[in-house]
Amino acid sequence: MKLSPLILELINAFKVLPGVGPKSAQRMAFHLLERNRSGALQLSQVLHNAMEHVGHCKQCRTFTESELCEICAHPRRSEAGTLCVVESPQDVVAIEQTAEFKGLYFVLMGHLSPIDGIGPSEIGLDELANLLDSKDLTEVILATNPTVEGEATAHYIGQMCSARDIQATRLAHGMPVGGELEYVDGNTLTHAFVGRRSLS
């Protein structure tokens, strides 16, 4: 059976989502057409509103509907003197859920990757430099992912901090809580040994 152009267009639209292949996209499209047209219309409206009204915070670059996000607008956050640098807005959400960090964030929207043509300007390091110069910071926490690119990005930002006499720290890596030693990969185990701390 040949699908109509509109159905094909709907299926292709779903394929822009991460992890959604042709079969999953087709299943989603057919589900909405068969069983949930009102839900589809609501999804369409909410999606349109989000694309129209959600932008980036002018200070930290996370998603917000205002000029400044709720965190950057909070006076106590600025007074903390700490900045946490992350790769994505999802990382901000994850850290906020711990309720451990009370400072400001800067969202890179990626990491350095010269092979892919992503250099310092593509991830906003000029904006980060301005933030480092304008804020009274005592510590910058580098919470980039523990990948080759994430480590390279952390190293680069660490040098930016060092040039300004700001302490740069890296999130600890190692054993997951509740994990069993035999299932931990060698790289993670190495990080766990290097980052071990005294109990006394």
Swiss-Prot record:
GO annotation (BP), single: DNA recombination
PROSITE patterns assigned to the protein according to its UniProt record, in alphabetical order: RECR, TOPRIM
Domain (Toprim) ranges: 81-176
Keyword DNA damage: yes
Coiled coil stretches, renumbered: none
NCBIfam families given in the database record: recR (TIGR00615)
Family membership: Belongs to the RecR family.
UniProt-recorded name of the protein: Recombination protein RecR
Gene it is expressed from: recR
